[in-house]
Every structure is written in C-alpha cells, then in structure tokens.
Amino acid sequence: MINIGIIGYKRGVKIINILKKKKINFNVVAMYDNDDAKLKLIKDKNIKIFRNENSFFDYKYIDAVYIASPVSHHINHSIKAAKKGIHILCEVPAFQKIAEGKKLKNLIKAKKITYMMAENYCYAPQNIALKRSIKKGEFGNITYIRSSYIHDCKDISFSKKNGKLTWRGLERKKFNGNDYPTHSIGPVSKFLNIGQFNSEKFSSIHSFGTKEISMSDIYSKFFPKKKN
C-alpha cells in the first residue's frame, strides 16, 4: 500500500479519481493547498489537510507525493520532498533553471528515490494509439517527425471578473517563451524511444519565441481603457 500526499487540490482530485478507476493499491493520506475554500471541499476524514507546506512535508506517513502546484513552485516542492526521502511525481516543467535541475538530480541520486516528471500529453489516447501503430511498423521506417502542441491559454491567464493574472498569466508576464517544451517533444520521444534507458538521446534542442501581442488584445476586450 502506497501512502500518497498531494499538493494542489484541483488536479489532485483528478488523480485520486484516476487511481480509483485503475484500482491501484494506494491511500491518499495528506493534501496541501493554500486555498482554504478548496480544502473545505474535501470530505474524506482519512485525508489530513495542510495549509502550511513545511508541516505537509514533515508528515511522516507520506511515501510519495504528487506535485500539482503552480509552475514556479515545482522545484521548491520537489527539493523539499527529496530531502525527506519522499518519492516524487511532479507536473511539468520540473524546473525553470539549469542549476535547479542539477541540484534536484544530485539530490534524487543521493536519497535513492524515484522521480517522475508527469508529462501527461505522452499518455493522451491519440498518442498512445499512434505509438502502438509505430511499434507495429505500420508507418514503416520513420526518419522524420514534425509535431506541435497547441494550447490557447489566453482565456485562463487572467480573471475575467477583476483582471487579476492567474499563475499562468504571471508566468507569461515574466517569460515569453516555451515553458512546456515536453508537451511537444515528449510524445515524439516515446514514439522513437529517445532518451529511454540505453536508447538514443537528443543532441540539441532549439526553441524560438515571437513577440506576444494577442494577450493585450483579448485583455482589452474584457477591460477596455476608460475614456477621459
């Protein structure tokens, strides 16, 4: 029986339902979120509620943690879990700076724990079906793949009630680039066994961004400038 702690109510509830459907032998023993209104929705008395993240990581009954917090918190939560010897399943991206990634990698090795980056798009039904067909040789000898993941996040980057930026909006404000590259290259890696066990690895990866102009347009539709 695996005792699981969850960080992040919204996606955390989804993962609980998925595990139940799969009939996996697990217990959700703890949940942390900084939104008190969401935590009050949890009716299961066996799940201990935490409003302080340090207290959450100090809870001795957690074997593994599912991290579904906003992007900027992923590395901090992962490092805290690793220091406690807790196995980790973390949403993407795992980190935002190379130095953070190296620190996490070294800590995982030192603590001898399991870490998995939850690149969910690899397991989308269409990608699983495509991988199966590729493995069967239905597309012959593949020498070139072009892929893209398109997710229009403009509508979920700010509140339409008060204009306040969501965590996605805050990320866009400080960084105009692709912070989810694994959504595009993850499935391709699965198709071609790139980076898996003793298989081939990417020699280089390039990402290009353009000036972001559409966000201001859609924002002004909801919150037009007041005329003097």
Question: Residue locations for each model-derived region?
Answer:
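N-terminal Rossmann-like dinucleotide-binding module
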Residues: 1-44
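Predominantly a Rossmann-like dinucleotide-binding segment in NAD(P)-dependent oxidoreductases
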Residues: 121-228
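Beta-strand-loop-alpha-helix segment that lines the small-molecule cofactor/substrate pocket
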Residues: 59, 63-64, 70-71, 75-122, ...
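Conserved acidic residues
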Residues: 29, 63, 143
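Nucleotide donor/acceptor-binding cores
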Residues: 2, 113, 140-143
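Conserved SAM-binding strand-loop segment of SAM-dependent methyltransferases
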Residues: 47-53
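Structural detector of well-ordered beta-strand residues that form the stable sheet scaffold
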Residues: 50, 89, 114-116, 146, ...
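Short, conserved SAM-binding/catalytic segment
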Residues: 41-47, 103-108
